[in-house]
């Protein structure tokens, strides 16, 4: 947490020390709110074994960008989503407790120093978590686990217009994962554990407007650790070198605007972290729902 505080202190110093009221540009703001609901229901006399269900997902995506001075540009991206599935028993037709279907809390701040060179230095901070950890049903844990990533290096904008941007960056990164682990389900006791590692990070962001109704966004994150705080604990086990593998997080979204408030979105995500699973994890969501743009 001290490293997080130091990052923001340095960023604020650059922002306010180098900016001037004459030069400062206005904020570029974008906030989208969305709600998707799917519902099936059957009467008690219905035959065939079908059961009713209700699935809902609420989301909020926002981007705040500002040029504080001739050389300092700051961009904060936040993505929040949470959804549940309510299912009905096939025999009794009673509704079971809802289960979580979607959960995401992702905030990233990127500060670039535009020196009019081939590449621009940058500092970045990213916070990743979920609203509810439901891995142990007996013990509710909120905003768990927490992943903090601080990085710095060089970046380059390969393509940029008013509605399109392709930006890549490469740098050194430090990660800390703070986990509230359950030690006693009866007494509902937990303890806080944390691990840290450091290595090299590559992030590429793509934002393209394909037409007045279709847009595409993509984010590819690659991370290769050079050291791991728990390496001694896994030494001599089959998992000894798992932490050295490259972690992958690739997100893609195609969004189609049907009308002012109705939107269709296809989202898929590919994750690979050998410490969690030897196989890649894939998620795909096709949604039709309401979207409201605040800005």
Predicted regions and their residues:
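Transmembrane beta-strands of outer-membrane beta-barrel pores
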Residues: 35-41, 80-86, 127-133, 158, ...
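Surface-exposed strand-loop-strand hairpins of Gram-negative outer-membrane beta-barrel proteins
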Residues: 38-59, 88-98
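Repeated loop/turn-to-beta-strand initiation elements of outer-membrane beta-barrel proteins
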Residues: 72-74, 118-121, 161-166, 212-216, ...
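Outer-membrane beta-barrel proteins
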Residues: 61-70, 108-117, 153-161, 204-212, ...
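Outer-membrane beta-barrel transmembrane domain signature
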Residues: 165-257
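Membrane-embedded beta-strand positions of outer-membrane beta-barrel proteins
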Residues: 31-33, 76, 123, 152, ...
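Extracellular loop and loop/strand-boundary signature of outer-membrane beta-barrel proteins
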Residues: 45-50, 92-97, 135-142, 186-192, ...
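Outer-membrane beta-barrel "beta-signal"
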Residues: 282-295
